[in-house]
Amino acid sequence: MNQRPSQLTRFRVMAAMALAVLAIYLVVLFNTQVVHHEEYLAKSIQTITRMENVEASRGIITDRSGRTLVTNQSTYSLTFDASLLKPGENQNDAILRLVTLCRDQGVAWEDNLPLSLDGAAHFTVDTLTDTQKSRFFSYLRDLKPTRELLAVYVRQHPELLKAPREGETALDPATAKDTELLKQTNSAALTNSLLLNAGVTPAKLFDWMREDMKLSDNYSDSDARLILGVRYELKLRKLGANNNAYVLAQNVDVAFCSLISDGQFQGAKIIRSSARQYATTYAAHILGTVGGISDYTDDLKERGYRMDDTIGLSGVEAAFEDYLRGTDGKRMISVNSDGKITGEYYSVEPRSGYTVELTVDLKLQQAVEDTLAVKVAQLNQKDHLDSRGAAAAVIKVGTGEILALASCPSYDLSTWRKDFAELRDDPAKPLTNRATNSPYAPGSTLKPATAVAALESGVTTTTETIFDPGYWKYPSATWENKTNCWKRSGHGKMNVTSAITNSCNTYFMEMGYRMGLDTLNEYYSALGLGEPTGIEVGESTGRQAVNESGQDQAPWAAFGQANQEYTPLQLANYIATLVSGGKHYPAHLLKTVKSYDNSEIIATGDTEPLNTLNISDSTLQAVKKGMLGYTTNGGSVAGPFQNCVVSAGAKTGTAQIGGSMKNGVFVAFAPYDEPEIAVALVLEKADAGAVLATTAVDIINAYFDREDTASILPENQLIP
């Protein structure tokens, strides 16, 4: 039967439409697969675009003449980023392959998980730095089983809690939530024994971590431990809201980089980074250290820090962190479906930190450290001691600029992290900056300050003489209650100048008795003793003498034999204040802050006086003359000072520290007529302060013999 015309027409229309759709499909297919093949292929595989932080280089540190002290070196680092894994790629397998490669190639990788399976499972918390302890503790409080056990232990030991900050309410352990309680716990107190006492054993923690990280039983314990070390670090970054890749190994060589670059190790990437490089082995205590953030606070987050950032930990690295820290850049990275990076570009270029120019003179710093080390070595060999220390400070009179600041023994900044445990346990305490953080009894170096106080307060004059029979006693005391002068036969008649030159204890005890302790301390404070010096790094302020058990300490405080203690930096600053007529300048390390290219000055050091003690010219000349007599005409240290290239005033001090042990103390200024520098030295366990005379002469000569490069240095140029 023949089809009707309408049906035939409908069929033809439908066939034409089908042919049209097919034609369109073929055209699109040809256009996609042939004409625009590369373009659409690229689009199909560029599936992920993300932003990555680019660390800025820290600023350079130089001395006052532009000599480089600290700079940066370019390095290669191996990172691991789980987001670069292919879909379906097992993260644990990828980590194990990468760590195995590192082990086979002899590349040390970052593994700070303090859990060892060598022999019997055991903790290694006691070997961690405070930064590492803080991070480990943050993980423990995030892991439910350990959080519960530690919270119980801390409630039983509330002394482990941090003291509340100013304005904060103290936490009630009984009502606080576990997480809040542990956030307020002092992580530095974490030890192997604390964990064990809290019921957290190595075996338990290992099992809990395997469960938390979802490690199957297919992994041996040793392989699981390798994986957990990396997963632990990745977890820390997640807890710190840090999306950056984990730096698995630093300073890897080019040969290792080539193994990673072939794409066989998913998640791995080689990045360029920088590390601190030290152009000198001197000034370690001044320069300080950099490292990881130990307490990742909300304040640091708000200031743009990430948990993995490097930050100044001590010294000027910490004091001038805001200048030295650069501004990180941002880089956009495109990753295809195979986990390969297909493109990257900077959205924000990183900006390096500023250049910090210190007041320190490197050549003088070297001379000071070397001569101190020689003196300490000589006495250690003589006395068979190995725990003796020394310190020195040199200040520019009239500005407060610190030209040199030394603490002996010192350490090597380039290896301090590796050597940390040894340095920490060394009885000589090389990590301690004795010049700023170790207060000492001043002994007779305080006598010039007492002389100023006595003359300016009016209890004596430059012409009054006091007879020294070889002892001093209270007017109402019996002869048996006297205090002997160091010269038992007595000095006879002494005025203020001769009393300084001859270091007459009797004279100064009488002055202390006349003034009283409050007046003495008032003048000592005005000269900078027992007060903050103004230095930008951490320091001890020492302490003024106080009366004990109802006994007046003024006579003994007047010649430095009471209970007062001052740092070497304070002693140098007091001498600088005295010889400048009472202008008390802040001791400081910052000279200028410059832009990275040295084209712009950003900031300068503080050179305004903290206070002024108006010392009369007659007082000043009487005191200076007494100190000059100490170095000339048969004075106690006249012999060594014959080798001094300029005239100088000085005063020694000897302070008993228990039994027959004494510390030697020495202060000086030079030149005599127009003083430029003030010097203070302390030598622990020395027979007397006079043993430091040759050391002081070496330092003064080094200052005046040095090449004054500051006056000949072209602008914006660094010198070697």
Segments from the language model and where they lie:
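Amphipathic oligomerization regions
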Residues: 684-706
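Conserved, well-ordered alpha-helix/loop/beta-strand core segments that scaffold catalytic motifs
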Residues: 245, 341-390
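Conserved helix-loop functional segments at active or binding sites
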Residues: 374-381, 408, 629, 705
